[in-house]
A protein has these predicted regions:
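Structured core elements
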Residues: 1-2, 31, 58-63, 71, ...
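Active-site cofactor/cluster-binding pocket
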Residues: 1, 8-9, 55-65, 69-291, ...
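Short, Gly/Pro- and small/polar-rich lid/capping loops
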Residues: 39-61, 449-456
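Ferredoxin-type iron-sulfur electron-transfer modules and their immediate structural context
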Residues: 219, 232-391, 399-457
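Generic marker of residues within folded, mature protein domains
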Residues: 51, 97, 117, 323, ...
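Hydrophobic alpha-helical segments, principally membrane-spanning helices and signal/leader peptides
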Residues: 48, 53, 109, 115, ...
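A cross-taxonomic marker for long C-terminal extensions/tails that follow the last structured domain
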Residues: 7-53
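Short hydrophobic/aromatic-rich motifs at helix boundaries and adjacent loops
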Residues: 47-50, 195, 221, 316-317
């Protein structure tokens, strides 16, 4: 008699794990889906296998919570299910951040019944709806040979792709004959009036163009009908914007000619946060747990590491090491229009923009290109606004609240790529936040005021 446990920690149960159960003839009691190096009861599932019926099209979409990706994919399922003789299936996977977090949509379509009650591991089509993900997640490797990869980015030129794509992605695309396409959904969203963050219908249209599940003209017609049904109560203007976005999405997909040089790329590059500092509890948690979980590799964390946090508590301050870089637009400071009100840092929900009081010596230690003004009312001190674009979510609250000087705002929301290009912008933030609080500055402006309060952060 054998007995085992599965689905521990809500983990997905795959065909490879079930096969491992049937092959097991040693462990009377076992677990699957986890790496148990404490009791050593876990079974090694080995390589993932495909059990979907032949001809089934598997798709995976990586989106950002609240960007509309999940809603668009639910519409896609309805369109295909209602207008073809195909079977359709969809699973949606979210992280705990919800809005602003990672969403993964797993879609399957086929002529035969689909009984795959698990997430897509090997896909015919993968779409990356946020360009920051390409350096954080191992998504291209989920494609089967000859599969299609769609990347939403603003740097779809040969030079931009050469600069931004990590070597392991280039190599995989080349070696596995991946059909690679790009689209600038943010630009299209702005041009069609949808805005920079509501890119769902744009990328849905691009998907139907590339997937060849339904003829492109019919798919566009069905999408427009769905837009009329969904947004009709909000007015014809909203419907027209969605229809324009649908047309533009299909027309602006760009095929990338993969150069032979990509097959010679070496090494791997991922934007993985590595913690350091005096707080060992934070450093250990970030490096052993958080970095892997944020990289969608949490299922590989062994039980011995997880058991360290058996009581459920985690150290505070670990979010500072995430540096997700998910914002579409980030604030850029124009010091000439700044009145030093500190409203911007006061309203920022993620502490991604900070107002700093610096001594002359500290100002001299700031990276080259950092603008430091004389702090009004405090001779001998300098004032600077520093922005962490990698922590910013692009909400725009800072720019909206900024009174500026004579109506000219001191903060302008700029595309992330342009904001990050400011001289030593991220390094200025990392340097400034390490300086101590100036007690005499806080006493001058009073801790009970907005300005005084922000100099205590």
């Amino acid at each position: 008699m054998f007995s085992g446990r599965y689905g521990l920690g809500s983990k997905d149960t795959t065909p490879a794990q079930i096969i491992a159960v049937y092959k097991n003839n040693e462990k009377k009691t076992f677990t699957i889906g986890i790496y148990d190096d404490v009791t050593n009861l876990s079974l090694d599932a080995g390589k993932e296998i495909v059990t979907t019926p032949e001809g089934t099209i598997c798709c995976k979409f990586w989106g950002l919570g609240a960007d509309g990706t999940v809603g668009a994919n639910k519409n896609s399922i309805k369109i295909i299910g209602d207008n073809t003789d195909m079977y359709a299936q969809a699973y949606f996977d979210y992280d705990s951040k919800k809005s602003g977090g990672v969403t993964m949509s797993h879609l399957r379509f086929g002529k035969k019944p689909i009984k795959s009650t698990y997430l897509v591991r090997q896909a015919n089509f993968v779409a990356c709806h946020n360009p920051a993900y390409i350096r954080k997640f191992n998504m291209s490797q989920e494609l089967v040979d000859g599969g299609t990869f769609l990347l939403n980015c603003s740097w779809g030129t040969p030079e931009g792709l050469e600069t931004h794509l990590p070597p392991q992605v280039k190599r995989f695309i080349h070696d596995h004959n991946i059909q690679f396409y790009t689209i600038d959904g943010v630009k299209i969203g702005i041009e069609t009036g949808m805005g920079p963050t509501r890119i769902n219908t744009i990328l849905q249209s691009a998907f139907f163009k590339l997937a060849n599940i339904i003829p492109e003209e019919e798919a566009i017609k069905f999408m427009k009908a769905a837009a009329q049904k969904t947004y009709g109560r909000k007015g014809q203007d909203v419907v027209d914007k969605n229809c324009a976005a649908i047309d533009a999405g299909a027309k602006n997909v760009v095929k990338v000619d993969v150069p032979d040089s990509w097959g010679k790329c070496e090494g791997e590059e991922y934007d993985i946060a590595v913690a350091s500092g005096d707080r060992k509890d934070v450093v250990d948690f970030v490096n052993n747990i958080q970095a892997k979980v944020n990289g969608q590799e949490g299922n590989k964390v062994p039980v011995s590491v997880v058991s360290t946090y058996y009581e459920g508590s985690t150290p505070s301050g670990s979010a500072a090491f995430e540096k997700r870089g998910i914002a579409v637009n980030v604030p850029v400071w124009n010091s000439a229009n700044c009145i030093q009100c500190t409203f911007c840092s006061y309203v920022c929900p993620h502490a991604a923009i900070r107002t700093m009081a610096l001594t002359e010596e500290e100002a001299a230690k700031m990276p080259a290109g950092t603008v430091c003004l004389n702090l009004n009312g405090m001779p001998g001190y300098k004032f600077a606004i520093v922005v962490s674009s990698l922590d910013c979510t692009g909400c725009g609250s800072c720019a909206n609240v900024c009174p500026g000087m004579k109506g000219n705002e001191a903060l302008v929301m700029t595309r992330l790529e342009e904001g990050m290009a400011q001289p030593n912008e991220q390094e200025a933030f990392n340097t400034a936040v390490k300086f101590p609080i100036k007690k005499d500055v806080v006493a001058k402006f009073k801790e009970t005021t907005v300005k005084g309060d922000q100099f205590t952060q």
